[in-house]
Amino acid sequence: MRQKDIYFMPLGGAQSVGRSCYYLRLGQSNILLDCGLQRINGATCSPDFHSLLTSQFMESMQQLDHVYISHAHTDHVGYLPQLMQMAPQASVYMTLQTKQLAEYRLIANSSQTGAAEASRLLSNVAPVNYLQKIKQRDYTVTFFPAGHIPGAMMTLFEYAGRKILYTGDYSLQSAFGLDGCWLPDDLEVDVLLMCALHAKQPYSVREKNTLPQRISEVMSNLRYGQSVYLQAFDPGRVLELLMALNREMEQSGQVYPIYLEPEAMAAVHVMESLQLPVLQQNNYSSFYAGAAHPHVVIGTKRKEQVSWRYRIFGNAYTLHEDYGEMLSFIRRLNPRQAYLVHCAEGYYGHTVEQELMRDAQCRTQVVFPEEGDIYTI
């Protein structure tokens, strides 16, 4: 290995969605970007640490120096407690909001013993602020807001005269009091490590199937006197829907009752116990038959279990950028190289790579890295 070379190795979530975890070597520093898990048919899939430990970089997890967590979705943070047990010496960085949300998610998905251990481990996390700069042994790192969900951050590394930006999941658009991502206008990036969900899906359009679109449809139904039932089978979805609805109602001045079924309220109570306020005056812990219409119910009932009085909205929506927004983001930064990870399966055989190759103003070489492969940047 040459001293000034930069090495990149996906350990999960390369050309798939789930268990995002990426190894980055800067000088003598061993770094992990995110540490997620994926559940498939009841089985838990973790990052491929075996490939890392049989590589030229590390022989033991005790050699890991730093971990940077972009945001609190399970596919980016879910395996962190296990990693912290394997590598207790590694410094872990995330924003305070991400730490709070991560603690909730990890507690909600663990046994009582596992929840206590997750809480203990997360107490050792070093919270960071946006625009904060930290000088490490071999490099400097700065954090920027990523949008997407509260607390999400982009991470900029400066090493050997080069700048490497890891986006994590991000959003260019502002919605419900949460601003989109922000980077300095004059920022020059050499290498972009980009979570690019729709990089292989040219007909992905943000206006379809997004959280803002979902909230807009809910509010439209309420204005016409139609009560709404929101299915939220994941605790994180409960919080996203409730917080987004509360923000929209506050901003519009049109406030309707929101009832939370027991499973949904349990998720909220955990967040409140972590000093992250969620509930508003129009939020109620249970629904009663005589409740005036229109109103919203957030719960876990299947379609056939819900009264015909309700317009039902399912659990599927996206918080990600669309294909066109991704292209504009890459063109704006115009990096020398862009490594696109966290990519959903394509279905038209067309990717952002072909689009950018036809752009004479764009210098970016696009790479779709594979898990377990080592890339010299």
Where do the model's predicted regions map?
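Hard-cation-handling environments
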Residues: P212-S307, V341
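Pre-active-site segment of Zn-dependent metallo-hydrolases
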Residues: A14-R19, L26-I69, H73-T74, G78-A90, ...
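Functional cores that coordinate and move charged inorganic groups
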Residues: M153-A244
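Active-site neighborhood of phospho(di)ester-bond hydrolases with catalytic His/Asp-centered motifs
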Residues: L32-C35, L64-D75, L80, Y93-T95, ...
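Metallo-beta-lactamase
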Residues: E103-A152, L274-P294
